[in-house]
């Protein structure tokens, strides 16, 4: 087969596609959910132990007792994953910690195993089961700890520099200059103090020492020293500075040098209070390291080998890349150009400070010699900041004014890191442990030291509570999107910049949300939500991974420096490493030996796209799809779509509903198999072997060593989104299977591939205006043949509780309900499985005791005779809500006797699952993969649809107007190639950025015997006449989305009212009304529709008495009475009175109108026996009239 026609690629064992890719894949996609699983594994293996080592040993205040950590272990989980789902429990394992209590007075050691609560475990699919629901912990993108330099122009055009030292936790340190060029420091966002005072406080008091240490005679430092004068001669300079700092940090408290020393030590030099984390130490050492800072500067001294005296760099020599390669090993040594400074006794830190200093010429003033000071590579074990870090960062800050060094871009992915599950959990666990530590200390001082045991000291409540809080209510712990496998996979690979310690939606500006050049190969530039979260929630690119520091890395093929050939050696680079290299694109043509075909290639260097000689190329992309996320990589011809529409396409694929008969796309991208395989919905074999038994519920595989693996399939489960989760076997008895092979398809899968929709026949044409504005006209065949039919399962729950008046009861005996309504209930009053139910039907019969009323004499007599008190109960049965009818698929009953854990006060709980078969109907939302969405506007009988010359009717008609302005031409290419694939009976793969070209599509059409322009004559099904022009007809993958009209349609009859305003509630869930808002009122006012407006604002809204009276009048056929005062007006009056205003309502004659309180109208509101009351009033009225009549007659007689 020639290259033009593509080549065959096998995906799994059941699907072969003709692939049009031209670029050889050198690296397989990684496991797509390893972001989750690897991080959690790290937490269990290392993170937990780290936490215990950090907090322990815990010593009491006198130092008599200490509690040490020995080891921990997780025991077997109480429930399996499936049982946890059914019991609404957590899938978790008990954590046991071995602790050792040492009594320093007696030398006695007690070891004990302490239970530390149940710890949620991650399932194989990378999710957690919390209270029976699957949840995902989304990774968080935060600013990395480290030292950052920034610059901004002031109003006079001067560049002001600023520096921020950000720890993982602890106080921030900021340096800045003011308009007069005086340098200041802020500690933890407090008021600023001259920068030199901080150095004095560290124990270097004199001006000369400061100039020597900072190695700078810059104007800014000199001005700062002038500003920082010795005010109180009784104190030394060090003590004075300490007191000044204390005054800023604790204003109003008596200041002493000692208290200031202990405060600063606690703020910056205590590892428990100040933590840079390994990543912060790594970033600070990297930024302050002389290797990067000396590049391209001219040295002002000769640098020689300290051992041999051999000259490495001559004075006045420029340090370029070659010189630096020679110098770098020396700079890494402890004895090369290092100087030690000893602080005075009065300083905060007593240890001497070692700095690495090299003299260079200032780039701004070549005569001026400036010191470049490094922190001498502080050891990685120092979690807190050191004086050397402070001094080196100040030196960098002053050197920026000399034109040395660079400022940082905070949106660069080298300065943002991810916190994945493991780290988020670890932080939460730390909070719990530190709360526990406080309790342990207190208990140590209270309890008898001779008899106390570790168990008595430990209170695990704070630990358990913090873990529970994290999984239950953290912003990053989310209810898993289980609409389809792609949604599930994308959710696990998501990054959020929101959440605790992150940004907030309102504060996030344009820059943070924007696509940055460092996103290339790390974060998808396409897949992000539309709306307020745009750019704050992102998706991991397909090949990216996260390194131990939390930075996102992407793979590149190394280019050999000697031969300039591309090797198969793969290096993973973080964003700041990548900045040093020139990287060629994946589609640069290569010869068979790996050398570049052309002498010049397109490449990237930082944020530039450059045409560059191949000799200067360091790396090459591994694949064209490494730029995008998995969902985006599922869009064929992505390169022909506008990015805004591609964004919609990527997002809408995640909302596709799993159909009854799914079909994989005829035109795929080749990633469908991998996406479905890794999503966790397919059944995957664990070992290789031979299939021995297959049915709908179980598959058995005989391993080569003779043992048997049994795999249970999930049948018709309800997924998180109420969709149907069902697995279907795709292997047969006798098949050989490999380890890690798909045995059974999950929802929205076919033959191991992702199958989110169908391949209907589509024409771009109009049809009587029915596809105006993105509407879709569909063939009735799609409804009749269940092409787009899906199953939805809803869960309904009823609890029988204990009430003050007695227990509720689940029963068939329901007051005032006819036998007909009970026909589908069993003897306990619970619906039968398989019964067909509609709105308002009883699912679970339940009665609740009513308050006992005073009995009449007759009733008391009856009770005395029959001995039984008439039970006063009301019907509180669970009924089918509006629009939720269907077939009862399952019923689960939970009781304490059955060993189920129920919440207090609940005696029994019944869950009913109702399955609905939803066919495609008018109002449903559909979409292609290119952001081409629309709603179904008309279902046309098959015989009326336009048909092709061979008589085949079209399935879907789309408006051609939806293509040009939206610039998603990919859908047209998808359509043509799909048509060719259908005719040829093949599946094709067109990978993103490396797919079928125009000529491939035309040759495929030719091969299939179709016209070269992909158009055909269509005939009108109603008249049989041909349409004037030929029409583009083809096969395009089309999805039905989760926004279905059945879930949205709603109408209120009689429903609930809001308590305070007495207005109807809003929304379908509350069975609410339609809001008639301010603007709608204007519309009626404009038309002068006074009476309509009046009834909308009174009877139909919150005139409580009026609406009852109106109801009575309608029932009796009498004229409707005048409206009363709306309740909201009464609320307004009450609010004003609450503010102390004496407000009265007067009529035209200045008489006060009595606003009766709601309590006075109680009977009316409740509407209890309103008709009886009304009848009684009528009778009284008639009686009065009759009396009056007789009285009048009497009067006339007497006259």
Swiss-Prot record:
Single annotated GO MF: DNA binding
Q: What processes in GO biological process is this protein linked to? A: DNA-templated transcription
Q: Give yes or no: UniProt keyword Transferase.
A: yes
Q: Which UniProt keywords apply?
A: DNA-directed RNA polymerase, Nucleotidyltransferase, Transcription, Transferase
> Which PROSITE patterns does its entry note?
RNA_POL_BETA
Keyword Transcription found: yes
- CDD domains from the UniProt entry: RNA_pol_B_RPB2
- Tell me the PANTHER family matching this sequence: DNA-DIRECTED RNA POLYMERASE I SUBUNIT 2
**Similarity comment text for this entry:** Belongs to the RNA polymerase beta chain family.
Instruction: Tell me how this protein assembles.
Output: The RNAP catalytic core consists of 2 alpha, 1 beta, 1 beta' and 1 omega subunit. When a sigma factor is associated with the core the holoenzyme is formed, which can initiate transcription.
- Recorded protein name is DNA-directed RNA polymerase subunit beta
Q: Which organism is it from?
A: Ligilactobacillus salivarius (strain UCC118) (Lactobacillus salivarius)
Q: Which gene encodes it?
A: rpoB
């Amino acid at each position: 087969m020639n290259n033009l026609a593509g080549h065959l690629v096998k995906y799994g064992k059941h699907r072969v596609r003709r692939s049009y890719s031209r670029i050889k894949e050198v690296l397989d996609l990684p496991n797509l959910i390893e972001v989750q699983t690897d991080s959690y594994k790290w937490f269990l293996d290392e993170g937990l132990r780290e936490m215990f080592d950090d907090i322990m040993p815990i010593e009491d205040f006198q130092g008599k007792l200490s509690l040490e950590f020995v080891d921990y272990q997780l025991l077997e989980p109480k429930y399996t994953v499936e049982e946890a789902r059914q019991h609404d429990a957590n899938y978790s394992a008990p954590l046991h910690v071995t602790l050792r209590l040492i009594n320093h007075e007696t030398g006695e050691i007690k070891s004990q195993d302490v239970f530390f609560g149940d710890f949620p475990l991650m399932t194989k699919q990378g999710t957690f089961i919390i209270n029976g629901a699957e949840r995902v912990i989304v990774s968080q993108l935060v600013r990395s700890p480290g030292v950052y330099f920034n610059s901004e122009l002031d109003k006079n055009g001067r560049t002001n520099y600023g520096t921020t030292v950000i720890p993982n936790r602890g106080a921030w340190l900021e340096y800045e200059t003011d308009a007069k060029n005086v340098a200041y420091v802020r500690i933890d966002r407090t008021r600023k103090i001259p920068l030199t005072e901080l150095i004095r406080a560290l124990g270097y008091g004199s001006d000369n020492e400061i100039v020597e240490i900072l190695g700078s005679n810059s104007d800014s430092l000199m001005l700062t020293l002038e500003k920082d004068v010795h005010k109180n001669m009784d104190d030394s300079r060090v003590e004075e500075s300490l007191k000044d700092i204390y005054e800023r940090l604790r204003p109003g408290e008596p200041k002493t040098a000692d208290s200031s020393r202990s405060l600063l030590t606690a703020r910056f030099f205590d590892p428990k209070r100040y933590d840079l984390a390994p990543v912060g130490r790594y970033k600070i050492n990297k930024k302050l390291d002389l290797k990067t800072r000396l590049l391209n500067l001219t040295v002002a001294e000769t640098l020689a080998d300290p051992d041999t005296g051999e000259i490495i760099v001559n004075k006045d020599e420029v340090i370029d890349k070659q010189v630096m390669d020679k110098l770098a090993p020396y700079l890494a040594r402890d004895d090369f150009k290092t100087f030690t400074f000893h602080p005075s006794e009065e300083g905060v830190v007593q240890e001497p400070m070692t700095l690495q200093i090299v003299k260079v010429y200032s780039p701004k003033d070549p005569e001026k010699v400036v010191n470049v000071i490094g922190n001498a590579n502080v050891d990685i074990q120092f979690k807190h900041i050191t004086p050397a870090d402070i001094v080196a960062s100040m030196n960098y800050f002053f050197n920026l004014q000399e034109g040395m060094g660079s400022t940082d871009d905070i949106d660069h992915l080298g300065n943002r890191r991810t916190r994945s599950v493991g780290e988020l959990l670890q932080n939460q666990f730390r909070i719990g442990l530190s709360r526990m530590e406080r309790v342990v200390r207190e208990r140590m001082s209270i309890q008898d030291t001779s008899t106390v045991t570790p168990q008595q000291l430990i209170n695990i409540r704070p630990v358990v509570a913090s873990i529970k809080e994290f999984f239950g209510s953290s912003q990053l712990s989310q209810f898993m999107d289980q609409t389809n496998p792609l949604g599930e996979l994308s959710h696990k690979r998501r990054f959020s910049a929101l959440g605790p310690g992150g940004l907030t939606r309102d504060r996030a500006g344009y820059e943070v949300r924007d696509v940055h050049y460092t996103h290339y190969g790390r974060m998808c530039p396409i897949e992000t939500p539309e709306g307020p979260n745009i750019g704050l929630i992102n998706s991991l690119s397909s090949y990216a991974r996260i390194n131990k520091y939390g930075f996102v890395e992407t793979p590149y093929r190394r280019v050999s420096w000697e031969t300039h050939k591309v090797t198969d050696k793969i290096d993973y680079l973080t964003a700041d490493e990548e900045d040093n290299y020139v990287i060629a694109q994946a589609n640069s043509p290569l010869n068979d030996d790996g050398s570049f075909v052309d002498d010049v290639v397109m490449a990237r260097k930082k944020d530039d796209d450059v045409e560059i000689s191949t000799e200067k190329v360091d790396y090459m992309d591994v694949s064209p799809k490494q730029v995008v996320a998995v969902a985006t990589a599922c869009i064929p011809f992505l390169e022909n779509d506008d990015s805004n529409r591609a964004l919609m396409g990527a997002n809408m694929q995640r909302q596709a509903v799993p159909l009854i008969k799914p079909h994989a796309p005829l035109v795929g991208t080749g990633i469908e198999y991998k996406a479905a395989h890794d999503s966790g919905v397919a059944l995957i074999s664990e070992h290789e072997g031979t299939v021995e038994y297959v049915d709908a519920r179980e598959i058995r595989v005989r391993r080569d060593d003779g043992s048997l693996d049994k795999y249970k399939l999930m049948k018709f489960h309800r997924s998180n989104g109420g969709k149907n989760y069902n697995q279907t076997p795709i292997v047969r008895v006798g098949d050989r299977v490999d380890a890690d092979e798909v045995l059974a398809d999950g929802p929205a899968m076919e033959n191991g591939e992702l199958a989110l929709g169908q391949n209907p026949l589509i024409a771009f044409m109009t049809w009587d205006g029915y596809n105006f504005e993105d509407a879709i006209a569909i063939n009735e065949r799609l409804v009749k043949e269940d092409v787009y039919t899906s199953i939805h399962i809803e869960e309904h729950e009823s609890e029988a509780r204990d009430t003050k008046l007695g227990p509720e009861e689940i029963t068939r005996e329901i007051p005032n309900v006819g036998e007909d309504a009970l026909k589908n209930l069993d003897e306990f009053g619970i619906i039968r499985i398989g019964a067909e139910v509609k709105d308002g039907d009883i699912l679970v019969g339940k009665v609740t005791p009513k308050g006992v009323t005073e009995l009449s004499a007759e009733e008391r007599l009856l009770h005395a005779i029959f001995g039984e008190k008439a039970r006063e109960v009301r019907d509180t049965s669970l009924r089918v809500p509006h629009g939720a009818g269907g077939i009862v698929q399952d019923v689960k009953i939970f009781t304490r006797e059955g060993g189920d854990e129920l919440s207090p006060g609940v005696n029994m709980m019944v869950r009913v699952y109702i399955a609905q078969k939803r066919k495609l109907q008018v109002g449903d939302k559909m979409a292609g993969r290119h952001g081409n969405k629309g709603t179904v506007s008309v279902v046309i009988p098959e015989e009326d649809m336009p048909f092709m010359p061979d008589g085949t009717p079209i399935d879907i008609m789309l408006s051609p107007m939806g293509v040009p302005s939206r610039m998603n031409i990919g859908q047209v290419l998808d359509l043509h190639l799909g048509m060719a694939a259908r005719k040829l009976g093949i599946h094709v793969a067109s990978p993103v950025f490396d797919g079928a070209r125009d000529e491939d599509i035309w040759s495929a059409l030719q091969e299939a015997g179709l016209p070269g322009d992909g158009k055909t004559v269509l005939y009108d099904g109603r008249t049989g006449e041909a349409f004037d022009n030929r029409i583009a007809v083809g096969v395009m993958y089309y999805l039905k989305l989760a926004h279905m009209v059945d879930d949205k349609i709603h109408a209120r009859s009689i429903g609930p009212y809001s308590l305070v305003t007495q207005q109807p509630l809003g929304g379908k869930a509350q069975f609410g009304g339609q809001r008639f808002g301010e603007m709608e009122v204007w519309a009626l006012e404009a038309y002068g529709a006074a009476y309509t407006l009046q009834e909308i604002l009174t009877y139909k809204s919150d005139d409580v008495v009026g609406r009852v009276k109106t109801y009575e009048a309608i029932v009796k056929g009498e004229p409707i009475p005048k409206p009363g005062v709306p309740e909201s007006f009464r609320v307004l009056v009450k609010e004003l009175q609450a503010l102390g205003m004496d407000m009265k309502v007067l009529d035209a004659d200045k008489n006060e109108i009595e606003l009766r309180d709601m309590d006075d109208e109680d009977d009316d509101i409740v509407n209890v026996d309103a008709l009886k009351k009304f009848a009684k009033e009528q009778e009284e009225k008639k009686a009065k009239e009759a009396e009056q009549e007789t009285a009048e007659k009497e009067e006339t007689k007497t006259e």
